Amino acid sequence: MSGSRSALSVVRLAACAKPCTLGSTSSVLTRPFSHSAQLCSPAKPSIKAIGELRKLVPGTSMLKAKEALLASRPASSPDTDSIALALEWLEADRKKSGAKKADKVASRTAREGVVAVSILSDGLPSSIEMQGELKDEAKRAGIGATSAAAGAIVEINCETDFVAKNEVFAQLVKDVVHTVALFPGLSAQSGAKRGLVEVPVDQLLAFPLLPSSREATGTSVSAKTVGSAIIDVVSRLGEKISIARAAAIVAPSVPSPDATRRSESGTARGGSIVELASAFAHGGSAGFAAAKDVSNPGYVLTSGKVASLVMTRFASDKLPDALQAGSIQSNIRALTRSLARQVAGLETNCIDSAATCPVDGQVSSALYKQPFMMLLPAAAPSLESNAQPVRQVLSTWASHNNLDSNGNNVVEVVDMHRWELGETIAPPDDAGPGFADEVRKAAGLA
């Protein structure tokens, strides 16, 4: 008996002295001696490597992380974990499985999600900028600053509120709205239009994804388009995700050197006009906390069930001096933010056109005719301002800050978007089955 045990040990050692990928020979050896297969199995991935991989790629299950570490091990070191190789394997796997999942869920209806807004620059020059030497191009544009407003609004849908609150989905939304804000300046989309311009979704999907922060760059080993980033998240979360609509701020184009200047046209002298962006969102989740940048007071990145993006023009010969003094910037931002709050908080459908803005109960849906209920105290010219129409408050604000100019409108809202989640989606009776419908059907409840 002892002799047979020794012979068995010799066979086991001989089998394991070679790499485990022995082909037919190893198969023959493992059939009579099952324990030899166990001896030749590669070492399990370490818990540390699994945890690190899941941390680098949020939404990755423990089983998928283990599979990636095992499948990506090089033949030369089959027992060594490589995070870098595992990341490459995961990315390739998500591209393959994500495309299949996207096709599978394409017929579903996505009613949940968020409306996100981003302002990279609100267009308001600091006192330091105003005291410095402005570029000739900026002076000709009449915007009074070397940087114009840049921002965007986008609605991204998913199937359930659970996914809408997920951190992976939230990061996708942040990156997409950041990309939309940069889209006009990096593409040929802007053309002759200015203000808030719709961005074609099909063009956006083919556009490179521009991460919203350095930390958001992630672990991707190759550049992503917006479309491939969505497929990547679909592979992780298993729900249909789609962009319903998107719009971006297109800043005024710089005129040619021989173009008529605003000071020559009689409208306002160069540098006395600024067009500022403001945004607000209501009904957001904790997973998408509003982002701030202490070095950029005009920066906004937030989302909710309803959001607004507003463009406001300030035009006064006295504006450059006020901006150089540096005492009015915070007051102006409080006013523009108040306008964005007003647009989002009330059913605001237009700026001042009674024909297209019917009265809803006691409150008009025309911005200028509404009582300025969302006016922040920092911008209020008087204690009674919240009860006064928006148009009247804007006029009073200009006088209060010594910016009134020959009876002209110093402050004007020139463009705005107020988007509410799901308002462009067909009613439930006309829509296809959603994820919840499929769950009820699978459970025999439908």
From Swiss-Prot:
Pfam families: EF_TS. PROSITE patterns: EF_TS_2. GO terms for molecular function: translation elongation factor activity. GO terms for biological process: mitochondrial translational elongation. Keywords: Elongation factor, Mitochondrion, Protein biosynthesis, Transit peptide. GO terms for cellular component: mitochondrion. Its main location: mitochondrion. It comes from the Eukaryota. Residues 1-33 form a transit peptide. It is found in: Mitochondrion. InterPro entries: EF-Ts_dimer_sf, Transl_elong_EFTs/EF1B, Transl_elong_EFTs/EF1B_dimer, Transl_elong_Ts_CS. HAMAP family: EF_Ts (MF_00050). Associates with the EF-Tu.GDP complex and induces the exchange of GDP to GTP. It remains bound to the aminoacyl-tRNA.EF-Tu.GTP complex up to the GTP hydrolysis stage on the ribosome. Belongs to the EF-Ts family. This is Elongation factor Ts, mitochondrial. It comes from Mycosarcoma maydis (Corn smut fungus). The gene is TSF1.
